[in-house]
Amino acid sequence: MKRIIYAISLGVLLAIPVLSQAIDTTPMIRVTNVHNGQSDESLDTFTETKFFGPYQFRVLKDAIETQGETKDIDGRVFRTSDGVFMHVKARSIDGNSMSLDNEIKNLVKERTIPEPTVKMVLPIKDSVIEVNNDGVRSLLAEFMYGWPLKNRTDMVLVTDYEGTRYYDKLQFYRDRLPNGVRIEQLREMIMDAQFSYK
C-alpha cells in the first residue's frame, strides 16, 4: 500500500512541471482596447479577429484575403465588396530606427504630397491620436482626402512592441460604408488592434 501511495505521489510531482509548461505554452491572452473610455461590443457582430505573428487585429467578416494588390504590402491584405481595404504588416526595428513620432511625421508628410499618377490627391484633414493599448503605445494617423478622392479615409495605426514595428491600415469610402456599420465603428476597429502575449 505504501508503494502505491509513493508511486502516486511521485507521479503527481512529475506531472506538475509538465502541466505548468503546457499552460506556459499557451501564448494568447485576449485584451480589449478601450479608447476614450468606450468599448463597442457590437464590433463582434460584424468583425472577426485574425492573427499576424503575435499581433491580433480585426477585419470585417465578409472580407476576403487577397495578395499582390500593391507592391509595398508585405503583410496580409483584406478587401470587401464595399470598398473597405485593410492590411497588416510587421517589420523589425534596428537600433538606428526612427522614433514612433518621427515615423508618423514622415507618414503625414508623404501623404500630403500628390501621388504622381493621380492629380489633386491631398488630404483635406489629417490628425494623429495616441492610443494606449494595455500599456503599449500606438499612434493612429487618420487622413481624409480631397478631390477626386473626397470620400476616402485612410487610417494607419503604428505600434512598437518588443523590437518589432507593426502597421495596421484601414481604407474605406465614406459613401460606401458596409451595411449597418458607422464610421466610428471602423475607427474603433483599427484602434482595437491588440497584442496577444505572455
Spans of model-derived segments:
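Positively charged n-region of N-terminal signal peptides that target proteins for export
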Residues: 1-4
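N-terminal targeting sequences that direct proteins away from the cytosol to non-cytosolic compartments
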Residues: 6-7, 11, 15, 19-85, ...
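Acidic/proline- and glycine-rich, intrinsically disordered low-complexity segments
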Residues: 78, 104-111
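Short, conserved charged micro-motifs
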Residues: 97-102
